[in-house]
């Protein structure tokens, strides 16, 4: 059963939030990394590319929280499907977010690694991400701009406007007692208070998502294996 829904855009600290939620007992947490490391999950999501209503219990089977796209794109549907779940909207300075989002969407990584030329044991993941493109195209059209596609340049003003629209939509839709607008730089205190759990006696996890993604691309292209994205070092 979904207990915490992440409504933030990618590159708003979603990897750090995944680690934090799992530390607080709300794991496993669904993140885009789950699709990368479990290519069979693609079939759960693909019907949404054409606007079909998803069976959320099937999509989220075994997970108790979610962060990042594609789940975060469907925050409203998830909030309706799981009315007892709380929602965390991760935010950051919109212009700093844009710089990070621009890096992510222009990354060569997955797009330039031909599945046929990749090490055999990462080919299923690359093929899975290729199959995800129709859904990613929908996310880009509806969240950012009707004429924008992943891998293309998006003007800063247009992207920042989309960011502000999204934050406003979430705020306007959900009651204050169900929503936390949260910057991961705030640390444990507001998150734990909102979720009604004790504050851990350890630093809040701050994962460098760009570094995680860059290392992942490098290992996929040359290492012949999928990286441990949330291993002991994180």
Model-predicted regions and their roles:
Residues 124-167:
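A conserved mid-domain beta-alpha-beta active-site/ligand-binding segment of alpha/beta enzyme cores
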Residues 92, 150-161, 171-190, 194:
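Phosphate-binding beta-loop-alpha motif at adenosine-nucleotide cofactor sites
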Residues 6-8, 32, 67-71, 91-92, ...:
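Short His-Asn-centered micro-motif
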Residues 1-59, 119-140, 200-234:
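PAPS-dependent sulfotransferase catalytic core
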Residues 81-103, 191:
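Conserved phosphate-donor/acceptor-positioning beta-strand/loop module used by diverse small-molecule
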Residues 14-18, 38-39, 74-76, 95-100, ...:
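Short catalytic/ligand-binding loop motif for oxyanion handling, primarily in non-cytosolic enzymes
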Residues 47-78:
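Conserved nucleotide-sensing/catalytic segment adjacent to the nucleotide-binding pocket
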């Amino acid at each position: 059963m979904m207990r915490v829904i992440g409504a933030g855009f990618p590159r708003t600290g979603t990897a750090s939030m995944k680690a934090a939620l799992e530390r607080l007992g709300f794991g496993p947490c669904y993140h885009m990394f789950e699709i990368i490391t479990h290519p069979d999950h693609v079939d759960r999501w693909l019907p949404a590319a054409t606007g079909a209503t998803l069976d959320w219990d099937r999509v989220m089977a075994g997970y108790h929280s979610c962060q990042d796209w594609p789940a975060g794109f469907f925050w409203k549907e998830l909030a309706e499907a799981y009315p007892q779940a709380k929602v965390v909207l991760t935010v950051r300075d919109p212009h700093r977010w844009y710089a990070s989002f621009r890096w992510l969407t222009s990354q060569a990584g997955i797009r330039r690694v031909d599945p046929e030329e990749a090490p055999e044991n990462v080919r299923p993941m690359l093929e899975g991400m290729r199959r995800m493109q129709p859904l990613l195209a929908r996310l880009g059209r509806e969240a950012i701009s009707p004429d924008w596609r992943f891998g293309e340049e998006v003007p800063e003003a247009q992207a920042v406007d989309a960011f502000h629209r999204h934050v406003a939509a979430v705020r306007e839709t959900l009651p204050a007692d169900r929503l936390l607008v949260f910057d991961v730089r705030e640390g444990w205190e507001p998150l734990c208070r909102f979720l009604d759990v004790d504050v851990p006696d350890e630093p809040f996890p701050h994962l460098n998502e760009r570094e995680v993604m860059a290392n992942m691309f490098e290992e996929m292209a040359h290492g012949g294996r999928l990286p441990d994205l949330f291993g002991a070092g994180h």
